[in-house]
Amino acid sequence: MKNKLPPFIEIYRALIATPSISATEEALDQSNADLITLLADWFKDLGFNVEVQPVPGTRNKFNMLASIGQGAGGLLLAGHTDTVPFDDGRWTRDPFTLTEHDGKLYGLGTADMKGFFAFILDALRDVDVTKLKKPLYILATADEETSMAGARYFAETTALRPDCAIIGEPTSLQPVRAHKGHISNAIRIQGQSGHSSDPARGVNAIELMHDAIGHILQLRDNLKERYHYEAFTVPYPTLNLGHIHGGDASNRICACCELHMDIRPLPGMTLNELNGLLNDALAPVSERWPGRLTVDELHPPIPGYECPPNHQLVEVVEKLLGAKTEVVNYCTEAPFIQTLCPTLVLGPGSINQAHQPDEYLETRFIKPTRELIIQVIHHFCWH
C-alpha cells in the first residue's frame, strides 16, 4: 500500500544509512543484504512481486528484481546497490547520514547511485500500477563498483526481455546511449635471478619487459589509427600503462617484472578481438622467451556499449528531455543489460560527484527526475 511508504527524504535517508560498500579488499567489502531487504519490503508494499537472487562468487551479495504487470515487453529501471569505500579523513560529514545543505543532499551513494531507488519509489506514488498494460521491472544489482558480478549474473540467467531499459547512473539527466569498455591486464615476465657481476648467468625480466612494452606501444598506435568513433571526446581506443614493478636490489639480475595496463575499447569491438590483438602484439617476446611471459586479467572485462540511435527509447527520451543523447568514456552495467534489450544510461546527479569525498546530489534534480520516471513508465507500460 502506498500509504505505508515513508516520505521521499526518509527513504533516501534509510538507503544512505545502510552500508553496502563493494571492495576487492575483503576487509572493506560488505554484503548488500540489508539494503536489498529494505528495497524488497518497500516494493512489496507497492504491490510488486519481488525475487531476491544470490550472486555466485561474491561475499553474500544479492540482486533484487521487483515486477508488476503482465505480458511481454515493458520497461526495466535498473541500478546498483553498492558504493565505493570512503576515505574517512577526507569526508567532512558522516557518509552514512543524509544531510541537506545549500541545495545539496550529502552522503555516500546519494549520486552514485542508491538515491535513484528513492526517486523510483517516490514516483510510483503517482502511478496507478493496476492499469499497466505492459510490465514494469525494477532491478537492483550487486558489486557494480568492483566486478559487476550482479549485472553479469542477472543478464546470463534471466528470461526477461523488456522492450527497453534505463540505468539510473548519475548523468545530470543527460541521456547516454554509448560508452567505452574496460579491459585491465597484468603482464608478468619471469626471468632468472643471478649476481649482477655476471649478466649471462641470468635472464633479466626488466629487459624482457622493455621489449614487451615496445610491442604494447606499437599496439596502442595501431588501435589509434585503425579504430574511430567520432562522437567520443577521445575518438579511439586508449591503452594506458598504469603500474610497473620489478626487481629487489641493484646488484641482482631481476627475476620478475610485472606491468599493469588497461585498454578502453570502442563499442563494437569484441573482447575476443582485443585479447587476440594483445596476444599478437606480445607474440615476438613469447616466441623468443618461451614460458616466461603471461597475461592475466586484473578485473573481469567490460565490453563497450551502444544503444541504436534510431531506437524508440532514444527518440522518446530525447523528446521528453529536449536533449540529445551523448556518449561517455566511463563504464556502467549497460553492456550487460543491453544483451536483454535496448538500454539508456540516465539519472540524477553528476558523474563528477561519483567516488568523491562529501558526495552529494543537488536538490534541483528531484522534481525533474520524478517527473521523468512517471513519464517513461506511462509511455512504455501504459501504451
UniProtKB/Swiss-Prot annotation:
Catalytic activity as recorded in UniProt: N(2)-acetyl-L-ornithine + H2O = L-ornithine + acetate
Catalytic EC class: hydrolase
Domain of life: Bacteria
One GO molecular-function entry: zinc ion binding
Pathway the protein takes part in: Amino-acid biosynthesis; L-arginine biosynthesis; L-ornithine from N(2)-acetyl-L-ornithine (linear): step 1/1
Details of cofactor binding: Binds 2 Zn(2+) or Co(2+) ions per subunit.
Keywords: Amino-acid biosynthesis, Arginine biosynthesis, Cobalt, Cytoplasm, Hydrolase, Metal-binding, Zinc
Names of required cofactors: Zn(2+); Co(2+); glutathione
Residues noted as binding Zn(2+) 2 in the record, renumbered to the chain: 112, 145, 355
Catalytic center residues: 82, 144
Gene3D superfamilies tied to this protein: 3.30.70.360, Zn peptidases
Binding site for Zn(2+) 1: 80, 112, 169
Subcellular location: Cytoplasm
Cellular component annotations (GO), alphabetically ordered: cytoplasm
Gene Ontology process terms (BP): L-arginine biosynthetic process
Chief site of localization: cytoplasm
Family per record: Belongs to the peptidase M20A family. ArgE subfamily.
Subunit-structure text: Homodimer.
Protein name: Acetylornithine deacetylase
